[in-house]
């Protein structure tokens, strides 16, 4: 999908116009040295999160490419790797048949709307399935209809995975990290409302609810 329009050029989508100019500049800066630095001003810390560009710089240095020339292949490689990881997560959560279809749909939509911003595309491809993991981390083990589970049924693997993802995301793109964290807050509010409704529901006695929870 990306290879066809880029086959005749060493530059990435949109060349060196608009925001691609500073992205190419940033990658070139971190190719010349692994030390974190601003894309334009010498001896200043980076203004933007640097993870994607830092690894891109190591990729360029490993292959002996100038930063501007490595930008295109690094964008394609990183997006492809993120798409594969996202598909693997979907397959793990909903099975290969549905997971492959969902992963393909997310990949196509991401390439359609976010490909010019490759580090954003990487986060979207991994972040969409990770939102399911974040929801599971907040809910714990059990059915969605049952609401959040007690503390002893917390899915700690999901909690750790969600925390690691949000932490890494913050080093890649602050805006999308805020989106993912905001979504987690909204999911938490939904669960809190669900708990409140369950507590206020007098149709089932409290001792029966407690006994039902102990049985799980």
List PLM regions with ranges:
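Membrane-embedded helix bundles of polyisoprenyl
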Residues: 1, 76-192
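Active-site lumenal/periplasmic loops and adjacent helix-entry segments of GT-C-fold
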Residues: 2-124
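Hydrophobic residues in alpha-helical segments
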Residues: 30-31, 138, 193-196
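Short hydrophobic "helix-edge" motifs at membrane interfaces and signal-peptide entry regions
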Residues: 54, 162-164, 211, 215
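Generic low-polarity alpha-helical segments
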Residues: 60, 134, 175, 215-216
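Juxtamembrane/transmembrane-helix boundary motifs in multi-pass membrane proteins
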Residues: 63, 67, 71, 149-157, ...
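Perimembrane helix-loop-helix junctions
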Residues: 180-216
